Amino acid sequence: MGTTIHEETSAAQPPLNFTDGAASKVKELIEEEDNQALKLRVFVSGGGCSGFQYGFTFDEIVNEDDFVMEKQGVKLLVDSMSFQYLVGAEIDYQESAQGAQFVIKNPSAASTCGCGSSFSV
């Protein structure tokens, strides 16, 4: 299994900031699905208008190379390739007049797209 960080008890600054809002929303969605084995997987893939794009999915499997972060009893998974692009990023959940969505604020992104899910390094 991969590296696990329990954000509530970790004294050092974690490599990712999984916000309370995001953790609460993930917990709510898992409860709606009635499947406590689900974890939120965040990944980076090639594509989008700026070269890379973020993706979110639910997964039951923790891969050997996954970075695992736990907050409020829910787990966030990031594969090793995606992790290098997400170090220092904040994973949040926001609601606005345009809708509600998970968002990533990434200080490593040289530029981002108006869609909010695409970036370049």
UniProtKB/Swiss-Prot annotation:
InterPro entries: FeS_biogenesis, FeS_cluster_insertion, FeS_cluster_insertion_CS, FeS_cluster_insertion_RrpA, HesB-like_dom_sf. The keyword Iron-sulfur applies. GO terms for biological process: iron-sulfur cluster assembly. Binds 1 iron-sulfur cluster per subunit. One of its GO terms (molecular function) is iron ion binding. Gene3D superfamilies: HesB-like domain. Transmembrane segments: none annotated. It comes from the Bacteria. Its cofactor is iron-sulfur cluster. It holds the Pfam family Fe-S_biosyn. Keywords: Iron, Iron-sulfur, Metal-binding. Iron-sulfur cluster binds at residues 49, 113, 115. Required for insertion of 4Fe-4S clusters. HAMAP family: Fe_S_insert_ErpA. Belongs to the HesB/IscA family. Homodimer. This is Putative iron-sulfur cluster insertion protein ErpA. It comes from Nitrosomonas europaea (strain ATCC 19718 / CIP 103999 / KCTC 2705 / NBRC 14298). The lineage of its organism: Bacteria, Pseudomonadati, Pseudomonadota, Betaproteobacteria, Nitrosomonadales. The gene is erpA.
